[in-house]
Each structure stands twice: as C-alpha cells, then as structure tokens.
A protein has these predicted regions:
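Conserved AMP-binding/adenylate-forming core of the ANL superfamily
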Residues: 37-87, 91-95, 112-117, 172-173
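Conserved pre-ATP/AMP-binding loop-to-beta segment of ANL
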Residues: 37-39, 175-197, 204, 228-234
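Conserved AMP-binding A3 loop
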Residues: 51-56, 186, 193-217
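AMP-binding/adenylate-forming catalytic core of the ANL superfamily
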Residues: 111, 128-130, 285, 393, ...
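Gly/Ser/Thr-rich phosphate-binding loop
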Residues: 170, 256-259, 282-287, 296-357, ...
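Conserved AMP-binding/adenylation subdomain of ANL enzymes
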Residues: 216-237, 244-283, 294, 298
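Conserved ATP/PPi-binding loop(s) of AMP-dependent carboxylate-activating enzymes
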Residues: 367, 379-411, 449
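AMP-binding/adenylate-forming catalytic domain of the ANL superfamily
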Residues: 504-529
Length: 546
C-alpha cells in the first residue's frame, strides 16, 4: 500500500476485546485512576453562563441515567433519542444510554418538529430526551409515534397534564432520585451503540448504525490527527454534538483519552472563539474552514492572544490554501485537515509527522488499510490513477449497517469491502488527493474533472468568499464545467474576470466555461453545499465571455 511508507515507523496493531462499552470507557476509566476530580467538560452558554462537570460526576450521573432508563422497562438495544443543545446533559444521556446497553440516537437542534418526528418514528425510539420548547412543538404530531412512551425534559420544566399516554418527567430531579446503580451492561464490542442520521438518496435521512468498537476504531486519530500530548490537553470544539464529526472529535474521543472538552452554545462570533481559547487555556482548537475564515476576517487576534494553543484541526469541507497560509502567518500554527464520513468517521488526515501539502487530504491513518480500487473489477489502481476509496469490512471503525435498509447496506458493503463512493488518487510520495463522490465528478468532453480542484484554485482568489463547481448539461449529451461564486462583501469583480482567472490557473479542460454569481448556496443542516440543488435560478449574474 502506497501510504504505508510514510508510516513505516508507526505500525498499528488492533486490540479489540470481545466485550467493550463506549459509555463506560468514556466516563469511568479516568475516574478510577486517581484523576476523578479532573474536569471532563466545560459548557459556555451565552444565556446560562459557564458550567462544568468532573469525570467523577460524569460517571455517576451517566450511571444514574442508565438506571433511570432501565426503570422504564425498555429492552436491550432500545433506542433513546437525544435532542439537546450543547449542554452537560448531552454527554450524561448520550453516554448513559449506551452504558445501559441501549442505542443512543443524537439529533440536531436545527431540525424541525416534523423532521424529529420522522427520526423518532424511523428509529423506533421509545425514549426522548429534549427541552420543553421542543417537546411542546412535538405534541401536535404525537399521533404519528407508536413506540415513544417516555420523555425526559432537560432544563426548564413546566409541570402540566398532557393529553396523551406518554410519561413526561423532569430529568434533573429524576436523576437525583437514583442513589444506587449497578455496573454498566457488559456489551460486546460488536453490539450496536449509537445511530446517527445522514442525508439519504431517497430524500429522507438514513440511519447509520455504529458498534461500541467504533470508539476503538478511532484510536489512531488520537496520535495521528489530534496529536494529543501526555499532559492534560484542553480541546475547544466549535461544533454541535449531533454531527458525527463533533460526536467523535468533541465528545467521545477526548473523554476516552481523559482530556477536557470545552464547547459553546450560542451565536457564532469570531472574537468569541479567541476569548474562549484564552479564558480556558485551550491547547487544541477544532472547527470547520468557515470558522477559521471568520476569525481571520473579523478579529485582529494574533499568536499572543492564544498562547496556550498548540494544535488546530479542521474537517467537514475543504480548507482553502489561502486560509491555511493566512492562519499560519497570523498564529504560527498549521491547520490539520481530515476526511471522514458518517459511516467511518475521520480516517484520512494530515499529521504532524509529515509536511502538509495544501490540497492533499494527507494519509490514511495507521491501522486503516484503505485501498483505491476500480469498482468494476476490484483491482487496485496504479500510481496517480483515480480509484474509489474502499475500506476492508473488518476495520473496527466501520459502521455496522444502514438502519432498516438492507438493500442499501448490501449495495455498499460486499466482496469484503465497504465502497465509500468517494474517489481519490495517490501521488508518488503517498499523499492522497481527494477527488469527490462519483456523482460530484464532472464528466466533460471526455475528461473527468474533480470539482474540488477547481474550487481550491478559486478559493485562493481574494474576491471569492465561497464557490461550487458543477457540471451543466447542454443539449442531449454535453456537459460544461461551470462555477457558482459567492463574492466577498463590496467586491466589484465581474463573472467574465473570474472566467479569465480560471483560464490562467487551470488546465483548459478544468477551467469553468461559465461563472455564475450567487448570494447563497443550498446547504445541509451541517452547512455542506448541496451540489445537486444548485441551478441557474439562484444566480444574480452570469459570464458571457467565450
């Protein structure tokens, strides 16, 4: 395997025990080794202020929640849906449910009531943990839920009678009633642990079921992406817990390694992140490229404002060369990117042991025997050739199956591999270059063009705030490479000038033939651009140069 030469001194041997439990591993290990008073999590809430919890209290409260669930009479592997903002009750309930052998179902606070109802119905959730506002928005639609029988309300609680058979309880007081509790359920490492939802091909979200071993499957990231130190790192994450990226890098992984996590609830403000780094002496900062870009544009902070910070990480979308270079110039720190997916979390990343090549995704982390295959014949592609990223089915980080979608699971998991649908190529030095999903790759006049290569070039233009390259069909069988651009505020550049910029900086077959100016892009709840929904109707200007 090409990438192995850069990790030749870092062989990885998996040690997956027969029995393992994520809830127990994330809450109990450090509380039993003499560091039980260490802070596990700090929440900075704009309205409620600062709150924190030690590993000892996280262990106790998550065990109390586990006992509370058992008392509801639900059976092993029943689903517990968690719909909460970033707060201390989130890890208590998310991890506590897994401690008891149930399946946690994290959901976004951005979802509408109808969307929550869909997830609750699809997952068959019997228990819901949420806040009073969300609960009252759900009440008119409860007739659609045949499985839900218990609701725990976090935070403010209004005691009143509801016209349904569902039990509604105040989470805090209910936890305090639990004074004795048993050990965590002795789950198998391969038992289901949590169920995350991602965009589906049918227009409905699809559930991705992970086993308890998934936590162990991400251990290489602790060394080769997080770059954890032997001391007590303090990780500030800018995301929300519902997202797979944040559930791993901002919750489970740091807690499993005994670190302190800092999260925020409230408005996203550039200077606010600098203030939090300084206040809590954060050593690791994790975000998406948009956050890094905002800090550079909207704050005057420099290295002296974040003296404790030593490591920065990014995922979710591609980081532009411009942001990478400006961040290094301003703060003296590199930003280490990773590529992942709901089915496999982050498994390809840049690392501190190798120079970063802007535009490259880095390397598969040790232990993950990633191969680039031709999906037609399952043969590895040659150096520099385009192949689908495929994961061996026995990789401990890989998901179990799609929830209630047997055909979908079989479509992507067969012949000993999980076929990600993402394409990439290796260069001669083992660096992996991500090309995108098969559906994203633009087939134009016999060429196959990665939208990411085009976008990387245009994001370096000082007038471009964001952009998306797609294929535009003309006639029956012709496709043009076109680019949609959102300009920086006050920019006067024209679409024609942007076409010329592409011709100067890209091979002729990659350069966009048309540039559209747009004010916004259709995006997912987590901020990813929905390329399939981009069309000329969203544009406010168009190039006419030939």
């Amino acid at each position: 395997m090409l990438s192995q030469k850069i990790n030749k001194n870092s062989t990885w041997v998996w040690d997956i025990p027969k029995k393992f439990n994520i809830g127990k591993a994330c809450t109990d290990a450090i509380s039993q080794d003499g560091r039980h008073d260490q802070i596990a999590m700090i929440v900075e809430d704009e309205e409620l202020g600062t709150s924190s919890i030690t590993y000892k209290d996280l262990s106790i409260k998550s065990s109390q929640f586990a006992e509370l669930l058992k008392a509801q009479g639900i059976t092993k592997q029943s689903r517990v849906l968690v719909r909460l903002p970033n707060c201390l009750d989130y890890p208590i309930c998310f991890l506590g449910a897994m401690k008891a052998g149930y399946i946690s179902v994290p959901t976004s606070t951005l979802l509408t009531a109808k969307e929550i109802i869909y997830l609750a119905r699809d997952s068959g959730a019997e228990v819901l943990v949420t806040d009073i506002k969300t609960w009252e928005n759900l009440i008119p639609m409860l007739g659609e839920l045949e499985f839900l029988h218990t609701v725990f309300i976090s935070g403010e609680f209004k005691k009143k009678k509801y016209k349904n058979k569902i039990k509604v309880r105040h989470l805090g007081p209910e936890l305090e009633k639990i004074t004795t509790f048993t050990d965590s359920v002795n789950t198998l490492a391969n038992d289901p642990a949590y169920l995350v939802y991602t965009s589906g091909t049918t227009g409905f979200p699809k559930g991705v079921l992970h086993a308890h071993r998934a936590l162990l499957g991400r251990k290489p990231a602790a060394e080769f992406w997080f770059n954890f130190s032997n001391s007590s790192d303090r990780i500030l994450h800018t995301g929300k817990f519902n997202w797979t990226y944040v559930l791993g890098s901002g919750l489970m992984d740091p807690l499993y390694m005994g670190k302190t996590v800092i999260v925020h609830e409230g408005k996203n403000e550039a200077q606010g992140w600098i203030n939090l780094i300084k206040k809590h002496k954060a050593t690791i900062f994790i975000g998406v490229p948009t956050i890094y870009r905002q800090i550079l544009q909207k704050s005057n902070a420099g290295r002296n404002d974040v003296k404790t910070l030593r490591h920065c990480m990014s995922a979710g979308e591609h980081l532009s060369d411009e942001v990478f270079e400006q961040w290094h110039k301003r703060f003296g720190l590199d930003i280490y990117e990773a590529v992942g997916m709901s089915e496999f979390s982050y498994y390809i990343s840049q690392n501190a042991n190798m120079p970063i090549r802007p535009g490259s995704a880095g390397f598969p982390q040790p232990g993950h025997d990633i191969q680039l295959l031709d999906p037609e014949n399952l043969r590895p592609v040659g150096l520099g050739e385009e192949g689908m990223i495929c994961v061996p089915e026995d990789d401990p980080g890989l998901f179990l199956r799609y929830w209630n979608l047997g055909d979908e699971t079989q479509k992507y998991r067969h012949d000993g591999w999980f076929f990600t649908g993402d394409y990439a190529r290796y260069d001669k030095d083992g660096y992996l270059w991500f090309l995108g999903r098969k559906d994203d790759i633009i087939k134009s006049f016999g060429y196959r063009v990665s939208p990411y290569e085009i976008e990387r070039i245009y994001k370096n233009h000082q007038e471009v705030l964001d952009c998306a390259a797609i294929g535009e069909k003309i006639g029956k069988d012709k496709i043009l490479v076109v680019l949609y651009v959102i300009l920086r505020q006050g920019s006067k550049i024209t679409p024609n000038q942007l076409v010329l910029y592409g011709r100067e900086n890209l091979a002729s077959y990659k350069a966009p033939k048309i540039v559209y100016i747009a004010e916004t892009f259709p995006k997912t709840k987590n901020g990813k651009i929905l390329r399939r929904q981009i069309e000329e109707a969203i544009s406010i200007a168009k190039s006419d140069i030939r």
